[in-house]
Swiss-Prot record:
Subcellular location per the Swiss-Prot or TrEMBL entry: Cell membrane; Postsynaptic cell membrane; Cell projection, Dendrite
Protein source organism: Danio rerio (Zebrafish)
Annotated region described as Disordered, given as residue ranges: 36-57
Topological domains annotated Extracellular: 116-460
Domain notes: The second transmembrane domain (TM2) is a discontinuous alpha-helix disrupted by the GAS motif, which forms the selectivity filter by adopting an extended, belt-like conformation aligned approximately parallel to the membrane plane. This peptide belt encircles the waist of the channel and divides TM2 into two discontinuous helical segments. The distal helical segment of TM2 interacts with the cytoplasmic portion of the first transmembrane domain (TM1) from a neighboring subunit, contributing to the structural and functional integrity of the channel.
Family matches, as PANTHER family: ACID-SENSING ION CHANNEL 1B, AMILORIDE-SENSITIVE SODIUM CHANNEL-RELATED
Residues under site feature: Involved in proton-dependent gating: D390
Biased composition (Basic and acidic residues): 36-45
Protein's UniProt name: Acid-sensing ion channel 1B
């Protein structure tokens, strides 16, 4: 016995006439699920796994309309512009105009604040602070006369003639010293500087610091452009740094010096090493900063007592883009701490080594010392050119933190007529010698305080954000949480769009894998058996009252 099952669909009267069967079939569909025993089961949407079916309906799509969002958003005014289920009215138009005006004013203020922030302005703050004690600065001094005449020999004049302006046909005009024992070695410029220098033991007559006696052993030798010089409280001789606990005269350094004018060289000619001055040059600096006394020192004359009242100044500068200070460590083979003087000495040394293949005696490094001829022909002119004209080679930026000392100088005549005889007798000199050679130098802190000069950012990022937040609240009544709401809304919209696109792709993929599917409504509308006609004759393979159909229609009928 042959069992034939036929599914007949019935069309309703309100079915659109002429609707394409294939179109109705493709628009909406649900799969007919058959159980294993052959009985009809449940319907479910295409693309779902029959074994994982949980219910008859899909998850409800989120409401992402602007009206719904702005109705619950904290952004003021937008809920009057975007109104749900209501046509655009004049009231909404006025609110939209006011809302756009507020947005424009807010953006204008934001642009103005951002432009001001990008100018990177700064202000300078000046303050004075007291201290219980203060570190005394380093004091470097040099005699204006570099070489002592009593130490010059005839060979010294021959070698050093180009540097001193002496020529072979000139009479020395001074008694010459015996030839030094060089033990077969060649003439050495460093040895000559050391042998002919003014000695601190001979120059220093009296020395006191804060009422305590000091001596030549407290002064460290150092080379500068003036030859051999001496630094007090250098911090590099194994001694602790000196501390002062009081301000005013008598609480600092007080020294009496003999500048030894009778040892000054005669002027044979004008060179860079020739001096016309008598006295000493002094520089007050920190222990971390090498002396640059030829450009930063001040002169002290004999026959006067000079009072130098100091005030420590601590300066703080801003790095780019607000300022132009140097915040990175120094890139030098000679110095560990960056300072303008360290940068200048390092740069001048490299410049001379590159252009003259030698270095001056006061310059660091291991390059050979320049000969007197190289001094005259190359080193001195190159250094003068570098200092006076070439501003591009040695560009030394200001360090972001530095200490300098402000100075106020005052003078009194010394010796008085009453004290001249006493001093002449005390030091076994004539009164004229005392008047021409003796000087007294007092260096002290004016008060036990220091001055701070600090650059501060005129407008920082926190101020910019605060101004933007204030303008945002003033014009549109928004806050940072409002911005988060906007981002959350955009996230939901993008997620919904992406998920819908992914679902469509998944549905198309399932259609291709599983074949055609059919919903109940489509089955009714499609009506594959509605073309039944009265047959006259039937082929052997065709059932009665069934015209020829497609594969799927044959299956359903």
């Amino acid at each position: 016995m042959v069992r034939i099952t036929c599914t007949i669909s019935f069309s309703t009267d309100d079915e659109p006439v002429g609707r394409s069967r294939q179109g109705s079939f493709d628009d909406h569909y649900k799969r007919v699920v058959w159980s294993k025993d052959g009985e009809q089961g449940k319907y479910q949407e295409e693309g779902d796994d029959p074994d994982a079916y949980d219910g008859p309906e899909d998850e409800e799509a989120p409401d992402i309309s602007l009206a719904t969002f702005f109705g619950g958003c904290s952004l003021h005014g937008a809920n009057h512009v975007f109104v749900e289920d209501k046509k655009f009215s004049i009231r909404q138009g006025l609110w939209a105009l006011v809302f756009l005006l507020a947005i424009s004013m807010f953006l204008l203020q934001v642009v103005d604040r951002v432009i001001y922030y990008l100018q990177y302005d700064y202000v300078t703050l000046l303050d004075e602070r007291n201290a219980k004690n203060m570190t005394f600065p380093a004091i470097t001094l040099c005699n204006y006369n570099t070489f002592r005449r009593s130490q010059l020999s005839y060979s010294d004049l021959l070698f050093m003639g180009p540097l001193l302006g002496y020529e072979d046909n000139m009479a020395p005009g001074i008694p010459l010293a015996p030839e030094p024992d060089r033990q077969g070695s060649r003439f050495s410029l460093a040895e000559f500087f050391n042998r002919t220098r003014h000695r601190m033991d001979d120059m220093l007559l009296e020395c006191n610091f804060a009422g305590k006696e000091c001596g030549a052993e407290h002064w460290r030798e150092i080379f500068t452009r003036y030859g051999k010089c001496y630094t007090f409280n250098s911090g590099q001789d194994g001694r602790p740094l000196l501390i002062t606990t009081k301000g005013g005269m008598g609480n600092g350094l007080e020294i009496m010096l003999d500048i030894q004018q009778d040892e000054y060289l005669p002027v044979w000619g004008e060179t860079d090493e020739t001096t016309f001055e008598a006295g000493i040059k002094v520089q007050i600096h920190t222990q971390d900063e090498p002396p640059f006394i030829d450009q930063l020192g001040f002169g002290v004359a004999p026959g006067f007592q000079t009072f130098v009242s100091c005030q420590e100044q601590r300066l703080t500068y801003l790095p780019p883009p607000w300022g132009d200070c140097k915040a990175t460590p120094i890139d030098s083979d000679f110095f560990n701490t960056y300072s303008i003087t360290a940068c200048r000495i390092d740069c001048e040394t490299r410049y001379l080594v590159e252009n003259c293949n030698c270095r001056m005696v006061h310059m660091p490094g291991d390059a050979p010392y320049c000969t007197p001829e190289q001094y005259k022909e190359c080193a001195d002119p190159a250094l003068d050119f570098l200092v006076e004209r070439d501003n591009d080679y040695c560009v030394c930026e200001t360090p972001c933190n530095m200490t300098r000392y402000g100075k106020e100088l005052s003078f009194v005549r010394i010796p008085s007529k009453a004290s001249a005889k006493y001093l002449a007798k005390k030091y076994n000199k004539t009164e004229q010698y005392i008047s021409d050679n003796i000087m007294v130098l007092d260096i002290f802190f004016e008060a036990l305080n220091y001055e701070t000069i600090e650059q501060k950012k005129a407008y920082e990022l926190a101020g910019l954000l605060g101004d933007i937040g204030g303008q945002m609240g003033l014009f549109i009544g928004a806050s940072i949480l409002t911005i988060l709401e906007l981002f959350d809304y955009l996230y939901e919209v993008i997620k919904f769009k992406l998920c819908r696109c992914a679902k469509k792709k998944h549905q198309r993929s399932n259609n291709n894998e599983r074949g055609a599917v059919l919903s109940l409504d489509d089955v009714k509308r499609h009506a594959p058996c509605d073309n039944l006609r009265t047959p006259s004759t039937y082929p052997a393979n065709m059932l009665p009252h069934h015209p020829g159909q497609g594969n799927f229609e044959d299956f359903t009928c």
